Design a protein with these regions (language model features):
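Accessory beta-strand-rich segments of carbohydrate-active enzymes
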Residues: 47, 81-82, 86-88, 99-104, ...
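Hydrophobic h-region of N-terminal signal peptides that target proteins for export
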Residues: 10-19
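Recognizes extended acidic, P/S/T-rich segments that occur
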Residues: 56-100, 110-117, 133-143
């Protein structure tokens, strides 16, 4: 009988040991996005727990945040008794802005068994001023030179008025066109990491060395363009190569520049298609290089002959 009890106890210990070893934490997210993320305030983090045992549940977690540039841990949540695993706030961390961080997490199950630490993920807390420092808005033509009418009144019966028709007829046709913007740069050292910050209005498609970056078709998100605009951050470390590199950005009108054609509900424009861009390349030797949008960029017309958020698109066959 004692032998049976010993055997059962041993099997239970082995069972818990296997479970502890097999509990893993994956799919780390920051603001519900995987991969490198840039935010402007305290992050909200998420993860998934995986176990081969049915019914395994999280009862606690611990988060550790490291400042990459300082090379040290700057915050640890300690063991927090909670089943929460999504949108977990780090407001208590009081993390500094304009810094780059990595983070990892471990969890405990219902038997109070801890998992191993997850693989690290990363995020940056940057103000938009820091993200686009030194860059300029660029495009084929400025709003002033394009003679674009001001205001949001051009819809419905207002569009039929002679003065409205005359105002829109006077707009320079260059302000309606889709354009390509291009900038070349040279890399002579081994790249540690590279990050690009892109705001292309109304919509943009970003490519590096001829390959599209990201999978968005309508970036950035729409906004009240006279109040705020959104931008995207990309980890382009794997796409920057030694030697010559070329940045390409295709711009379209989107809701930023609705000038009508084929079909319309309204006409409103905040300006011709425009770009603000900054890329930071960090090298293994500790130096870095920054490429920003400015007067040294080149532009040309794209194969898109017509584009309107309501009227669709006409392209030139290659």
């Amino acid at each position: 009988m004692n032998y049976r009890k010993f055997l059962i106890a041993a099997l239970l210990v082995m069972s818990f040991s296997v479970q502890a070893k097999d509990i893993t934490v994956t799919r780390l997210t920051c603001e519900m996005r995987e991969g490198r993320v840039t935010i402007s305030d305290a992050p909200r983090l998420g993860w998934q727990m995986s176990s081969p045992e049915n019914g395994t549940r999280q009862t606690a977690y611990e988060i550790e945040v490291r400042d990459v540039w300082a090379g040290k841990v700057v915050w640890n949540s300690g063991k927090v008794k909670s089943a929460r695993s999504q949108l977990v706030s780090c407001a208590d961390a009081a993390l500094e802005k304009d810094r780059h961080y990595t983070w990892r997490v471990r969890v405990w199950d219902e038997a109070d068994t801890p998992s191993a630490w997850s693989a690290p993920s990363d995020f940056s807390i940057l103000t938009s001023e820091a993200a686009f420092a030194g860059s300029e808005w660029i495009g084929a033509i400025t709003r002033k030179d394009a003679r674009i009418p001001e205001g949001r009144k051009y819809h419905g019966s207002e569009l039929k008025k002679p003065e409205a028709k005359a105002a829109w007829a006077a707009v320079d046709t260059l302000a309606k066109k889709s354009i390509y913007l291009r900038r070349e740069f040279h890399v002579a050292k081994k790249v540690k990491d590279a990050t690009a910050y892109v705001c292309g209005l109304g919509f943009y498609e970003f490519s590096l060395n001829g390959e599209k970056v990201g999978d968005s078709e309508f970036a950035p998100l729409w906004s009240d363009y006279d109040k705020s605009v959104y931008y995207n951050t990309y980890d382009v470390t794997s796409q920057v190569k030694k030697g010559g590199n070329a940045i390409g950005v295709l711009l379209g009108n989107g809701f930023y520049n609705v000038q009508g054609g084929r079909y319309r509900k309204l006409q409103i424009s905040f300006g011709a298609p425009t770009l603000r861009f900054r890329m930071v390349v960090n090298y293994e030797d500790g130096t870095s290089e920054t490429i920003v949008s400015g007067k040294d960029w080149k532009y040309d017309f794209s194969p898109v002959l017509f584009n309107c958020i309501y009227g669709g698109e006409i392209g030139r066959a290659s």
